């Protein structure tokens, strides 16, 4: 999320005079990126090889990480020549950025690595909607050239910090999320009895299939499908959306980013699970609770596109705007 003072240029605040001085003195450090590709799609291998070769020709060393089966990468005549890593923090440690070729699922897994190493992440869409991606595969070459030329900027996106506790207050697990944290019922034959809490005060109790707590970035994902509003990414807020709640009060809530949201389950209800960004999980026995706060560390988001979020929303969801005439001055 963009906040005052958090935007950087690609040289982390260095002005043109500083860059000229560094270039003249030969003091520039060696550049390296981590390239993450969804290898489950054959076409992605060729595009990843194209990107890796172009980055290397541009003077940037490349590491490669496969989110699915690593074997196709190892066997590939081009990608097999680069250093290969698994899903570990070390894969992104010390790199300039993580470049992701894939859909939103691949992006979220790569963001997990980038966040752990505190390095920026750039998404290039190879999926369908790909709302988290900054660029489309048709312009892959341009995106790579922009990285080589350091023609990008970085903005911070808000995250969530999650702690699950049992009935006695013991910590069951911790985690974080870029998109959302969902509390989901494990018993598909009944409802999950919960009570929603904001800033240590009860809001409402209800039976439901689950509760979603989302960032503005995640408001276009699972929360949107559950009937939540779209929040502009520049907004600092926490979004709460219930899933099939059995209550008259089931409207989405938008609360302060400084608030703590908690979802507590009834001791006699079903077990549940906390799912973060669709793939990190914490088991919740009956009577457990999950506490969600603003995360202390944002995700550093690489921006290439200068178009406003409104245009992005219209394009990604193919919203009809026929007949719009614009403001009159």
Swiss-Prot record:
Annotated region (Disordered), positions in chain: 1-26
Keywords, alphabetical: ATP-binding, Cytoplasm, Kinase, NAD, NADP, Nucleotide-binding, Transferase
EC primary class: transferase
GO biological process, one term: NAD metabolic process
Active-site feature positions: 104
Cited InterPro entries: ATP-NAD_kinase_N, ATP-NAD_kinase_PpnK-typ_C, NAD/diacylglycerol_kinase_sf, NADK
EC numbers for this chain: 2.7.1.23
GO MF term (any one): NAD binding
Keyword ATP-binding: yes
SUPFAM superfamilies in the record: NAD kinase/diacylglycerol kinase-like
Localization terms from the record: Cytoplasm
Record's GO cellular component terms: cytoplasm
Pfam families, per the entry: NAD_kinase, NAD_kinase_C
Cofactor: a divalent metal cation
Binding of NAD(+), residues: 104-105, 109, 179-180, 209, 220-225
Catalytic activity field: NAD(+) + ATP = ADP + NADP(+) + H(+)
NCBIfam families: PRK03372.1
Family according to the record: Belongs to the NAD kinase family.
Known function: Involved in the regulation of the intracellular balance of NAD and NADP, and is a key enzyme in the biosynthesis of NADP. Catalyzes specifically the phosphorylation on 2'-hydroxyl of the adenosine moiety of NAD to yield NADP.
Protein name per its UniProtKB record: NAD kinase
Organism encoding this protein: Corynebacterium jeikeium (strain K411)
Gene responsible for this protein: nadK
């Amino acid at each position: 999320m963009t906040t005052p003072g958090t935007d950087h240029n690609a040289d982390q605040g260095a002005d043109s005079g500083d860059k000229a001085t560094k270039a003249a003195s030969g003091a520039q450090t060696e550049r390296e990126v981590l390239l993450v590709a969804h290898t489950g799609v054959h076409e992605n291998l060729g595009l990843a090889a194209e990107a890796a070769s172009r980055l290397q020709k541009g003077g940037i060393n490349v590491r490669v990480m496969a989110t699915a089966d690593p074997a196709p990468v190892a066997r590939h005549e081009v990608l097999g020549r680069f250093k290969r890593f698994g899903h570990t923090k070390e894969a992104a440690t010390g790199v300039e950025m993580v470049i992701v070729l894939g859909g939103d699922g691949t992006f979220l897994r790569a963001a997990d690595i980038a966040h752990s190493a505190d390095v920026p992440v750039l998404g290039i869409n190879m999926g369908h909607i790909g709302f988290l991606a900054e660029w489309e595969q048709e312009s892959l070459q341009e995106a790579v050239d922009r990285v080589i030329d350091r023609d990008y900027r970085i903005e911070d996106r808000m995250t969530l910090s999650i702690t699950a506790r049992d009935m006695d207050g013991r910590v069951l697990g911790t985690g974080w999320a870029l998109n959302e944290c969902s509390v989901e019922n494990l018993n598909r034959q009944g409802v999950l009895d919960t009570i929603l809490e904001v800033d240590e005060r009860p809001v409402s109790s209800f039976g439901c299939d689950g509760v979603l707590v989302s960032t503005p970035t995640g408001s276009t994902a699972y929360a949107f499908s559950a009937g939540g509003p779209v929040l502009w990414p520049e907004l600092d807020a926490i979004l709460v959306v219930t899933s099939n709640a059995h209550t008259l009060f089931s409207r989405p809530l938008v609360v302060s980013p400084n608030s703590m949201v908690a979802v507590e389950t009834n001791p006699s209800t079903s077990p549940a699970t906390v799912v973060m960004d669709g793939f990190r999980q914490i088991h919740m026995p009956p009577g457990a609770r999950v506490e969600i706060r603003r995360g202390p560390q944002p995700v550093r988001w690489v921006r290439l596109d200068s178009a406003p979020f409104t245009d992005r929303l219209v394009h990604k969801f193919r919203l009809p705007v026929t007949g719009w005439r614009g403001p009159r001055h």
